[in-house]
Amino acid sequence: MVKIKKTKGMRKQIRLNEVEEINLLKQWIESQKPDSGFNPLSLRPLPKDSKIGKSEDGKNGTVFSRYAGVRKFAQLPISDKTKRGLKDAKYVDMTDVQSAAIPHALCGRDILGAARTGSGKTLAFVIPILEKLHRERWSPEDGVGCIIISPTRELAAQTFGVLNKVGKFHKFSAGLLIGGREGVDVEKERVHEMNILVCAPGRLLQHMDETPNFECPQLQILILDEADRVLDSAFKGQLDPIISQLPKHRQTLLFSATQTKKVKDLARLSLRDPEYISVHAEAVTATPTSLMQTVMIVPVEKKLDMLWSFIKTHLNSRILVFLSTKKQVKFVHEAFNKLRPGIPLKSLHGKMSQEKRMGVYSQFIERQSVLFCTDVLARGLDFDKAVDWVVQVDCPEDVASYIHRVGRTARFYTQGKSLLFLTPSEEKMIEKLQEAKVPIKLIKANNQKLQEVSRLLAALLVKYPDLQGVAQRAFITYLRSIHKRRDKEIFDVSKLSIENFSASLGLPMTPRIRFTNLKTKKKGVYESSIAMEIENAQEYEAPLVVKKDLLGEDLEEEDFALKPRKEGKVVEKSTKEEEVLIPGNRVLKNKKLKINLHRPFGSRVVLDEEGNSLAPLASVAAEAGTEVALDEERMNDYYKKVGAEMRKADIEDKKVDKERRREKRMKQKIKRKRGAMEDEEEEEEEDHDGSGSSDDETGRNSKRAKKIVSDNEENGGKINTDSLSVADLEEMALKFITQ
């Protein structure tokens, strides 16, 4: 296809058409905007034969079609460029959340939207972004007009891809700012020219702090994707500084599957009369109806057996497995990978580099495999190919976490299945899920198909010693995650069979764990923390000293909370211990005595012939009754005698040292002389080869060389300085000097 070169007149006509289109869209939006608080879903869709947009009526003049409650993107008051992008991306029909949110967003209102996972929330804010900047005729010279904040890098990258698909016919510049990759300097150079920024909170704050003159005074719209997670305390230290640098007069859109309505959170964002859009609030279920959800009661020591058996019986499926900590992910992935279940295994967690995470993510999409992951994949991600199973080996922290996890399957009305493992002490989680309108069914395991993997893991730990440290960290971090959970009705470490759980990981001995109460001096409150001790049968019972070279390079603060973070004043340990979870049930060595740090220094003990201790100077004391008095004459004689011995020894030491240094200098001088002679010989050989030097010079050099060459031919004609005496070395050095 040949491109037609646009003339000046054509470009002018295009600008006029854009201005005319923008004016038409503004009139359309203003004339048919829904009332605040109105639910567009309560209206019926427009008839198929109804006219869209502007029309002329003889009685009322110019009228516009209604766009609230429509079900197709073509019926919205949006630009032709956006419609073309939607059509190329094969987006035709609108979902419920899109139909409810977009009409209010086009009017410039703040929105607080909640909808099920996989319901199309991304398009619900991407379209208003493009239209807002299009109506304002935004250009790269205007700077940043929109910021989209996502809690994870993968979700930000996915949103950036959708934005590029739909907005490819617009001329806006967009940038993706996420951590874990190189190119920060390049970002600093170009971030000022971006109109739309899709970013993670940490990277955006880094540019606000480090990039010169990076400001957003003309920001038009702010988007928080997975808003309940972004507003969580984990991102508070990053989000609050970001919000403080943004203008208050802006449009703000918040979207998530589980939304917050806390006044404090809304006040932080300066929302102005937001529209609360909860599409599925009145629905019978809180999860997609096409999702089949099951739960099994599995003891903690049987979880890996059950997981292994499940994988072996579903080799032709795409399975997403959630675990509590990244240490568990690492151990289960490495151990199962060595056992070769017959299906590709992948792992993904937050500490991996961004390139590696995206590579694993792409590989999981391409083929049927098992992906072990943490909650880093629990939110927002839309896999191009449907996930068949979501398996939650560990109980989620709350109902919201469960909904986000199972939301990775059964997206956009596709079929999906989920399986949740609960220990007997976590059965109350079923009641909480049912209260939240989650239709979950309790099933029993088929013990005939259960394959025990604990013995295989024990053999692996013997064969691969490095894997034992990974297993220990997985054991400890899992118990720590349970201990840190707030809902103590469900999560109780004391109700778990710790020794059996340790054996199920293949560990020969159970790591020792102790829980203590920590009191913060500044706040005056008790904080629960976990102190851990790992000991072998040969070791004495003492607190664990955490060092990276002992437990591996990947030991991180979040895995071992031995000490709380110090904020201002020192955090003191309470003398009272809650409990010792695992008592020492094996013979240990006696405790080593500690050195008394407060002992007096410089003390001296003198013993007599019978072994009794005396005063240091008692040997020179005068024998005069019971009183101890010093004999000055004997003391002076003693000092003179000792002084004479020291002076004599000092003279001998000086002689020995002088002789040693003299020999060292001689050896160095001989080496230097020998090196100089060899250099001269090489130069003479080169002169002889190149210009025919005289025989006299060659003879003199050969005679001189004979003088420094030893007669011992076994050494190859080299001087053996180690076998020569000092006198020989002096004589040889004197000859060299006279020459």
Curated annotation (Swiss-Prot):
Q: Which Pfam families match?
A: CTE_SPB4, DEAD, Helicase_C
Keywords from the named record: ATP-binding, Coiled coil, Helicase, Hydrolase, Nucleotide-binding, RNA-binding
Name of protein: DEAD-box ATP-dependent RNA helicase 32
Q: Which GO terms describe its molecular function?
A: ATP binding; ATP hydrolysis activity; RNA binding; RNA helicase activity
| Record's GO cellular component terms | nucleolus
Supply the source organism for this entry: Arabidopsis thaliana
Query: Its catalytic activity?
Result: ATP + H2O = ADP + phosphate + H(+)
Q: Where is the composition biased (Acidic residues)?
A: 678-688
- Coiled coil spans: 643-689
Basic residues compositional bias, start-end: 661-674
**Entries under Gene3D superfamilies matching the protein:** P-loop containing nucleotide triphosphate hydrolases
Q: Where is this region: Disordered?
A: 656-725
Regarding protein family, the annotation reads: Belongs to the DEAD box helicase family. DDX10/DBP4 subfamily.
- What does UniProt give as the signal peptide span? none
